[in-house]
Every structure is written in C-alpha cells, then in structure tokens.
C-alpha cells in the first residue's frame, strides 16, 4: 500500500502561519497571503520582462515557484529578518534549517511527484 501523502497538510497550514512577528501591522498577514501576492507580482514582472525587454522567462513557472516559496515556514514559522540575517553565520544556519524543511515538505509527496516539485519547493534547485 502506498504511503499517505501529507503534502497538502503542509500547504494548507500556510494561512495559519503569521508573518512579521516582531512588527506592528495594521492588518496581520500570513504566509499564504504573502505567497499569493508575491506570485502575482512575480508573474507580472516576468510578463513585463518578456514584452518590454525581450526576455525569455516562463511567467507561469515564476508564479508557481512564488506560490511555494515559503512552504518551509509551515514547519518552523516565519523567522524575522533581523534575526535571520544578524550575521553571515546565522544566515547560513537558517538556510540549512529551511533546506531541511523544504526537503521534508518534498518528501511528504508521493515519490512519483517529487522530481517535479523538487524544482519548485527546494530553493537550491530554483
């Protein structure tokens, strides 16, 4: 019997993870909202690059990567930038943690889909 996938649990947890924990926000934002907004802006920028500057970028791929770019935060939450980038050594360690979470998220998919999503979820592959 195939192993059960928990991938959707990772993704559907995104609205529960709040961003900007140390900042006052008029309207609290979660990583699902953030990822959606980033996907829209990224898609538009790719279209502009192609139409105005003779680019050769796939806007759909750019938008897809943007939708998943914070998936690892469903494991450890949103780490605030002043902490994450306090110095180069700390930043490297946080990137390692994010990589482990990205791999865990990827491993939550059935094996037959992992090759497709590896290039979307694992930041080192993007």
Language-model regions, residue ranges each:
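Short alpha-helical hairpin
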Residues: 4-22
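Divalent-cation-assisted or electrostatically stabilized phosphate/pyrophosphate-binding catalytic cores
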Residues: 86-102
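Alpha-helical phosphate/pyrophosphate-handling elements in metalloenzyme active cores
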Residues: 27-60
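Membrane-helix exit/interface motif
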Residues: 46-50, 72-83, 109-118
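Histidine/acidic-rich helix-loop-helix segments that form or flank divalent-metal centers
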Residues: 57-63, 107-126
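Active-site alpha-helical segments that house and flank conserved acidic catalytic motifs
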Residues: 40-46, 60-79
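An active-site-proximal "capping" alpha-helix that borders the catalytic cofactor pocket
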Residues: 38-42, 98-107
């Amino acid at each position: 019997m195939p192993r059960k996938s928990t991938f959707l649990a990772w993704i559907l947890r995104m609205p529960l993870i709040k961003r900007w924990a140390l900042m006052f926000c008029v309207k609290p934002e979660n990583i699902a909202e953030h990822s959606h907004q980033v996907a829209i802006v990224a898609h538009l920028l790719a279209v502009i690059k192609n139409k105005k500057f003779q680019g050769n970028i796939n806007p759909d791929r750019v938008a897809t990567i943007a939708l998943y770019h914070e998936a690892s935060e469903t494991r450890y939450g949103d780490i605030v930038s002043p902490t994450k980038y306090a110095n180069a050594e700390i930043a490297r360690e946080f990137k390692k943690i994010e990589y482990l979470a990205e791999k865990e998220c990827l491993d939550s998919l059935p094996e037959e889909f992992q090759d497709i999503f590896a290039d979307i979820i694992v930041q080192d592959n993007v």
